[in-house]
């Protein structure tokens, strides 16, 4: 099959799943769309060197997470440059593409306050319900370290809610 | 109560995010439209390849030279006093390290670039 056609089939198969994963990390639709486009651009440019023994979904998820993390860093830089202090929860509740309630917005704010690794591990485990063995392959981290990160993330989020109850 | 259960009971796992109408219908076409016709490989690896081979040759020569200088004392001269060789060695070592630094400076390569070439080549 033509390489481009083969890649198009891959985009069709994985784009929606990857979009939701990215969206849960970067939160806004605009950013998620940009990150998704960049993810496939990176994947296309590295497609020839992709090791066919590896799982395609693992490879794509890894690129998507790296791109999402880069986007968060860029946003952080822009936010501090503009000295914006609007909370994540308030921003989400004002977003036309967020239809959650205040508690759901608070959970997103709590997740957003976590360090990068804990945030990623929590998203993959809690929402995607991914096995630690799979997360380990994506993030290239030991299962023990991932379990510790998830446990700390859950504890911090719980404390976040209890402090505001 | 289990802390994970606390979060699940308080918030749940519902997806609160939405996308514009018809977003996923056009997504594949939109992604494909933004891709170049052919994958774009980094130009640097092709451009720098001759430099890498030159650097590898210089390193090989330096290693061969160092091995020759530090060959066992008995092979250098059976009549030379052992003490003289023992005193001379640190000086030679310093001198060889100097050659490596000079060579690296001359080639304007650092370890990251060498690793990048090795990654590209294999």
What residues fall within each predicted segment?
Chain A
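Short, charged helix-capping/linker segments at alpha-helix termini
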Residues: 1-9, 19-38, 48, 143, ...
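C-terminal edge and immediately downstream basic/flexible tail or linker adjoining helix-turn-helix-like DNA-binding
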Residues: 5-8, 27, 78-82, 137-140, ...
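Sigma70-family region 2
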Residues: 38-55, 75
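DNA-recognition helix of helix-turn-helix
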Residues: 58, 65, 69, 139-164
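A short pre-motif secondary-structure segment
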Residues: 121-125
